[in-house]
């Protein structure tokens, strides 16, 4: 929501009033509320949320499309693609398809890590939804603790949080990173 990678927060939205009241009670009892500065950061971000989300989605759609045609990419995961298993649900629930794109690269784990290391416009990082584009290798970063479990991600997976930069810069960066 903040959009500037400088605050962590969240929301629980439920359709059941009794559950909402129970959650509010527990939140109040635990003191799990945002501080004034964090609240201000989120409020600041909400002022540009709509235009940021439009640009995230627009850029991510173009990135996903380019990746589907790249010879070194074996699979692209983006709900905006008709072949994505969740596409129909996403199309019903969402105005656009967001800025998160994952893809699998030919050559396994080392090739995926190399793509991350070669990126210049995409910054290596473990956040999402900010104005800047980020790239990560989840198997070694956010999901490293899941190795060997049912939650393990494919070793050749690269995850992108597509930002609001000029899309041509993003596409060129991924082209050169993929080699």
Where do the language-model regions lie?
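Active-site C-terminal subdomain of aminotransferase-like
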Residues: 1-100, 104-137, 153
């Amino acid at each position: 929501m903040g959009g500037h990678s400088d605050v962590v927060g969240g929301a629980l939205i439920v359709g059941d009033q009794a559950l909402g009241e129970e959650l509010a009670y527990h939140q109040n009892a635990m003191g799990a509320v945002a501080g004034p500065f964090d609240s201000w950061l989120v409020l600041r971000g909400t002022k540009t949320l709509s235009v940021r989300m439009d640009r995230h989605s627009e850029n991510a759609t173009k990135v996903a499309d380019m990746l589907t045609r790249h010879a070194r990419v074996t699979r692209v995961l983006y709900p905006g693609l008709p072949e994505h298993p969740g596409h129909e649900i996403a199309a019903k629930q969402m105005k656009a398809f967001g800025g998160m794109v994952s893809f699998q690269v030919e050559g396994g784990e080392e090739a995926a890590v190399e793509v991350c290391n070669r990126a210049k416009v995409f910054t290596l990082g473990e956040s999402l939804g900010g104005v800047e584009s980020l790239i990560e290798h989840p198997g070694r970063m956010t999901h490293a603790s899941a190795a060997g479990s049912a939650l393990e991600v494919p070793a050749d997976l690269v995850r992108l949080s597509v930002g609001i930069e000029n899309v041509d810069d993003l596409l060129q960066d991924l082209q050169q990173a993929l080699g």
